[in-house]
Amino acid sequence: MIFIYIFLFLSSAIIDSNGFAMAQKLEAKGGKGGKEWDDGAGHDNVAKVYIRGGLEGIQYIKFDYVKDGQSVEGSIHGVSGSGFTQMFEIDYQNGEHIVSVDGYFDKSGVMQALEFKTNRKTSEVIGYPKSNTKFSLGGVNGKMINGFHGSAGKALNSIGAYLTKVPPTKSELVGGWGGDYWDDGPNYDGVRKVYVTYMNTCIRSINIDYEKDGQVVTSSHGNKEGETEEFAIDYPNEFLISVEGTYDSILFPDHYVLVITSLSFKTSKGRISPTYGVVSGTKFVLESQGNAIVGFYGRNGGAFDAIGVYFSPI
């Protein structure tokens, strides 16, 4: 039974050159008429949605997509007649993306109304939903829609979508600019344990045990001279969601440097670690609502100079 399930999933997925699923193709919903169209799944995001409506339903739909940070105009699916055109814009440059679509079609197989939901807002219902059959696409936690397909003739008959994983986001780097830069990247499933070495003036180092495909991967950064304490996260039942701390200019060893002076950690279950180091200077908090920390980056030399994190949806 497990083998059959995997086969069925992959049969509706876009596969990369290494055999990994890049996007899942969701079956088109609506009527059976019209000619099939497919915008594909090779986009980074959706920038704008244009819908042309009339007395008999939605005449056409058009999407502007995002590729390599630039908006790319898409094709019209359907025809343009007398009616109204409405546009729904996604703030893709600031992390907004479509998570689901609700639609309504009538007995003749013509799409009558559509509603788009992003991770930040919901569009108005575009069209006339009353007394029509409703369907939904997407709405999977941690996933986003990055492409559409469907069928259209003299009107829009059906619509489907491509569902892909929401890409990680990178926080700002906080602290000083001394030491060497390092970056663990965002390609981990979660964090299992954090080790912090500190002295009475600053943080010296941080070690992280990551989870990756069922294995523990350890990353070490900084000088391990000092007192070391650890904070464990019960992954996958618990996630690291926040790093709080301070940074300050201290004398180390014979000149002043801007370094991280304290750190503490918070999990999705509300557990908070002790504060490691000494609280002094400027306070910072690295967190993003609805996201877990899946990677760290920073700078370190003799002391721990700066820290940043990667977020991924829980």
From Swiss-Prot:
GO MF entry, a single one: carbohydrate binding
Q: Which SUPFAM superfamilies match?
A: Mannose-binding lectins (SSF51101)
* UniProtKB keywords: Lectin, Repeat, Signal
- Does this UniProt record's set of keywords contain tRNA-binding? no
Which SMART domains does the UniProt entry name for this protein? Jacalin
Q: Which family does it belong to?
A: Belongs to the jacalin lectin family.
Name of the protein: Jacalin-related lectin 9
Say which species the protein is native to.
Arabidopsis thaliana (Mouse-ear cress)
